[in-house]
UniProtKB/Swiss-Prot annotation:
Belongs to the bacterial ribosomal protein bL19 family. This is Large ribosomal subunit protein bL19. PANTHER family: LARGE RIBOSOMAL SUBUNIT PROTEIN BL19M, RIBOSOMAL PROTEIN L19. One of its GO terms (molecular function) is structural constituent of ribosome. The gene is rplS. It comes from Paraburkholderia phymatum (strain DSM 17167 / CIP 108236 / LMG 21445 / STM815).
Length: 127
């Protein structure tokens, strides 16, 4: 392992101190809690939507979450190991056949729905 990879691994471990990032994939509905600083106040803001893309690049990993707010599509990119992320909760697993769901940008209503992934009894017993 070269020096840069070691430094990145140390930074990832430092960013994850006390936090756990769940396994999630494109198509999953997640609730991302973000620490927001307004003046001298600090609060947690929840952002719920569908993961349409995930980018695995070590310390530079990120994911894009899309939601519909007031009839308008809103996308937000989150850095996976950012200190501003308070927590990530997977609300629902989606069953998709693509890694990038950018086609959802052109769709609205029923055509933008994602099927729910059914968990087999074997997996449910393990979890």
């Amino acid at each position: 392992m070269n020096l840069i990879a070691k430094l990145e691994q140390e930074e990832i471990e430092r960013a994850l101190a006390g936090k756990t990032i769940p396994e999630f994939a494109p198509g999953d509905t997640v609730i991302v809690s973000v620490n927001v600083v307004e003046g001298n106040r600090k609060r947690v803001q929840a952002y719920e939507g569908v993961v349409i893309a995930k980018r695995n690049r070590g310390l530079n990993s990120s994911f894009i979450v899309r939601k519909i707010s007031s009839g308008e599509g809103v996308e937000r990119t989150f850095q996976t190991y950012s200190p501003l992320l308070a927590s990530i909760v997977v609300k629902r697993r989606g069953d998709v056949r693509r890694a990038k769901l950018y086609y959802l940008r052109e769709r609205s209503g029923k055509s933008a729905r994602i099927k729910e992934k059914l968990v087999s009894k074997d997996r449910a017993a393990q979890a």
